[in-house]
Regions:
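Active-site cradle of extracellular carbohydrate-active enzymes
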Residues: 170
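Acidic, polar low-complexity linker/tail segments
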Residues: 2-59, 66-73, 77, 85
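Short, Lys/Arg-enriched charge-dense amphipathic segments
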Residues: 45-49, 109-127, 161-162
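VWA/integrin I-like adhesion module and closely mimicked acidic/polar interface patches used
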Residues: 173
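Histidine (H) residue identity feature
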Residues: 9, 33, 97, 135, ...
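Von Willebrand factor
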Residues: 51-117, 120-167
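Surface-exposed acidic, glycine-flexible loop patches that form ligand/cofactor-binding
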Residues: 47-52, 89-92, 154-166
Length: 173
């Protein structure tokens, strides 16, 4: 994963095709998608490639509980394009490899953590639409925000750190 580059025209074609559709029509999963299930995942890797010789891992963990579940929809339809084009235009980091995580409630939800691959191109959009928007949570103020941090610490590997001694970035929304 992590080869290719982001095509804003293809992304905006996706957003145009989803305009006016209900969130449930785009996010049709009613259980965790096998490609997003962290169970049994040893590593998710962000590696340098010919297209991205200085890959920088960037993880965006999104709260998908009932009170915040709309964020995944907004990020897929609007925020992803802004994120990628802003990074590519301003260049605060080199060769971004983006991973999305969906965060729920480990006490109440069936899918408290979902993880994409690291992607440098539009494949991230397809993975985003596979997210199971459980809209759960227990109202117990116990969303599992530590789960993405744990996964990133123990189940990711990236050339940015191994070759250049630079850490990646993780944002929890």
């Amino acid at each position: 994963m992590g080869s290719g580059s982001f095509d804003s025209h293809a992304y905006f074609s996706f957003t145009s095709s989803t305009a006016g559709k209900a969130t449930d029509d785009i996010y049709a999963s009613r259980t965790i998608h096998k490609d997003l299930d962290p169970k049994g995942v040893k590593l998710r890797e962000s590696r340098d490639s010919a297209d991205n010789p200085n890959a920088t891992p960037l993880i965006v963990a999104i709260d998908v509980t009932g009170s915040m579940g709309i964020l995944a929809d907004v990020i897929a339809r609007e925020g992803l394009g802004v994120l990628f084009t802003s990074i590519l235009d301003r260049k605060p980091i080199s060769d971004p490899h983006v991973m999305f995580m969906a965060v729920g409630d480990a006490n109440c939800d069936r899918a408290p953590l979902q993880i994409s691959q690291f992607e440098a191109d539009n494949r991230i959009v397809e993975q985003l639409t596979q997210i199971y928007l459980e809209h759960g949570g227990g109202g117990n103020n116990f969303e599992s925000y530590n789960a993405p941090w744990y996964f990133a610490s123990f189940h990711t590997a990236h050339d940015s750190m191994e070759k250049r001694g630079k850490r990646g970035y993780l944002f929890t929304v």
